[in-house]
Amino acid sequence: MKYKNLRDFLELLEKQGELKRITQEIDPYLEMTEIADRTLRAGGPALLFENPKGYEIPVLCNLFGTPKRVALGMGQEDVTALRDVGRLLAFLKEPEQPKSFKDLWSSLPQFKQVLNMPTKVLSKAECQQIVFSDAEVDLYKLPIMHCWKDDVAPLVTWGLTITKGPSKKRQNLGIYRQQLIGKNKLIMRWLSHRGGALDFQEWKEARPNQPFPISVALGADPATILGAVTPVPDTLSEYAFAGLLRGNKTEVVKSISNDLEIPASAEIILEGYIDPTETALEGPYGDHTGYYNEQEYFPVFTVTHLTMRKDPIYHSTYTGRPPDEPAVLGEALNEVFIPILQKQFPEIVDFYLPPEGCSYRLAVVTIKKQYAGHAKRVMMGVWSFLRQFMYTKFVIVCDDDINARDWKDVIWAITTRSDPARDCTIIENTPIDYLDFASPIAGLGSKMGIDATNKWIGETQREWGTPIKKAPNVVKRIDDIWESLNIFAPK
């Protein structure tokens, strides 16, 4: 399925019973969060609040609130098909030279997909049907959600922030939360390693004290939105990846006030700049950890132009203790990561980021172990190969007879195959998510790897235990007579 814009996607969701229109008046202050949270935890539909209290623009929440809807947004029918997306990314990250004509022929589908990567630049777009500039800009007219009662202010959550470094060939798309502090002012909260922050730092070094241009898109098509949260190779733009997912080139249009290209399909666009000398204290906000984060100074985004469709939809979400929408996205994108990791480490059988681990803070890996110390090599690989895992605090490595997605299996492996002193690897002074207040220093903390594999010669001096196995002939015999035993017959 190809979705040219958000509305195409919503039409499909509605046909499949995956979208609920809410006509009753609902307040963006706390009430939408409460409804969205209850709905997501029950595995419910996307929500379109058509009558937000005090506003004329409807609010879309819980769009990617189930793994199925994430898969649909990527043009797949179910989550398992996302591994095909991962295989494509693995191919693009490290393409292999064809060894024969047969290899070249088998690679043609992937190369045909690559042809859809360039963007298609339009001269005009629906996202610029209505234009407010300078003094006309009033962000308070947008139904920006105030998610939790102790949040300091309303928060823009699903904005696709578009930036470009002065020496970069391509633009960067990233999603960073933005605190509303004035009619035309937002605080841009991006961490120093993220693409937008790196572009900004490069700009400040190359053009000191000059305003840094920014555009933010709200309500783009699902492929573009998901392209901004997927681990695309550094050499591939998010727009190009969205084109691969969609099967058609991503349509863009030039911003009104700068040279940045914005998604033509977007519902609402914010354009403006960051003054390198202007910062403001951000937060506190309830975030994906389930706690309120610390306050810190971040750059201020001054909005000079607000453009939109004639009948826009405001796309929003909330973050809180898992499960929340970021956790669901992490669970679905887990399937994308697996082929990328397996291309570098073929011994990996499965890789799992439990949603309750705040999307990325704990990983369970199962491997076909081949030598002593193998588990430790895989730990180091997980932490270093993809930057998405630089903040993963715990990596548990198990053998391939363990189901990485079954905590009972994993706990059994840890308690029977690992010794705390021998099998726990602790690395200090490593990068840690700034939001992780458990670390002793903001942004710097430790990591732990647990080797829960069977030990080989060189790893133990003792005879290793042999797992209990059932007799196959007995299992078959009992299978045949099980129903007749009536052990679980109704009382």
UniProtKB/Swiss-Prot annotation:
Entry GO CC: cytosol; plasma membrane
Give the location in the cell.
Answer: Cell membrane
Kindly indicate where the leader peptide sits in this chain.
none
Q: Which UniProt keywords apply?
A: Cell membrane, Decarboxylase, Flavoprotein, FMN, Lyase, Manganese, Membrane, Metal-binding, Ubiquinone biosynthesis
Q: One MF term from GO for this chain?
A: 3-octaprenyl-4-hydroxybenzoate carboxy-lyase activity
Instruction: Give the Pfam families listed for this entry.
Output: UbiD, UbiD_C, UbiD_N
Primary residence = membrane
What InterPro entries does this protein map onto?
A: UbiD, UbiD-like_C, UbiD-like_N, UbiD_bacteria, UbiD_Rift_dom
- List, from the UniProt record, the residues annotated as the active site of this protein: 287 (proton donor)
Q: Does the record carry Zinc as a key word? A: no
Positions bound to prenylated FMN: 175-177, 189-191, 194-195
What processes does the entry annotate via GO biological process terms? Answer: ubiquinone biosynthetic process
How does the cofactor attach, per the note? Answer: Binds 1 prenylated FMN per subunit.
Pathway as given in its UniProt record: Cofactor biosynthesis; ubiquinone biosynthesis
Subunit structure and binding partners: Homohexamer.
What family is reported?
Answer: Belongs to the UbiD family.
What is the recorded name of this protein? 3-octaprenyl-4-hydroxybenzoate carboxy-lyase
State the organism named in the record: Histophilus somni (strain 2336) (Haemophilus somnus)
Q: What is the lineage of its organism?
A: Bacteria, Pseudomonadati, Pseudomonadota, Gammaproteobacteria, Pasteurellales
